[in-house]
């Protein structure tokens, strides 16, 4: 059987300080990829870094709001400078409002749409040019509403 290897690949998993994103990033690390993740707050990035370290993974964490195009562009440029060009993007960052829809305000729904739909577009837009230059890349989008 051929072993699955991501040696030499850089994987950015958004919102991967914990939960599904953390589990996905751990799988990429176990396959040999260099793991990069972001979260919206420094405290979440710090907790994520500690969790990866506890699992024996050297991850790279960045504070970035995926709905802010300037922050995303700056993060991607910083990752490319410090870690390398992103080969794999997993758009995992998301938000869920745990309230009945009929109780949700339009502003709350717009926040969900902004993070869960616009965020993946903004991050993908930032990484695609380098993927095109390299001649390859993978983008995986995860979304729930």
Which role does the model predict for each range below?
Residues 100-101, 108-113:
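Substrate-binding pocket helix/loop in short-chain dehydrogenase/reductase
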Residues 33-48:
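Conserved glycine-rich Rossmann-like NAD(P)H-binding loop of the short-chain dehydrogenase/reductase
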Residues 10, 17-19:
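Conserved glycine-rich cofactor-binding loop
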Residues 42-43, 62-75, 106:
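The beta1-alpha1 cofactor-binding region of Rossmann-like NAD(H)/NADP(H)-dependent oxidoreductases
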Residues 144:
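Residue(s) in the substrate-gating loop at a strand-loop-helix junction
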Residues 1-10:
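Flexible N-terminal pre-Rossmann segment of NAD(P)-dependent oxidoreductases
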Residues 124-125:
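A short, exposed helix-loop element centered on a Lys and neighboring polar residues
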């Amino acid at each position: 059987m051929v072993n699955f290897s991501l040696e030499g690949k850089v994987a950015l998993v958004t919102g991967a300080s914990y939960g599904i994103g953390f589990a996905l990033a751990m799988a990429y690390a176990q396959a040999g990829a260099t793991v990069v993740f972001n979260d919206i707050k420094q405290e979440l990035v710090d907790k994520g870094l500690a969790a990866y370290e506890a699992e024996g993974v050297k991850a790279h964490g960045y504070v970035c709001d995926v709905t802010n195009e300037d922050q995303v562009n700056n993060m991607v440029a910083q990752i490319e400078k410090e870690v390398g060009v992103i080969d794999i993007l997993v758009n995992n960052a998301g938000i869920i409002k745990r309230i009945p829809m009929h109780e949700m305000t339009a502003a709350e729904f717009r926040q969900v749409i902004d993070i869960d739909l616009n965020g993946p577009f903004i991050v993908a837009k930032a990484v695609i040019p380098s993927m095109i230059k390299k001649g390859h890349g993978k983008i995986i989008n995860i979304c729930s509403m």
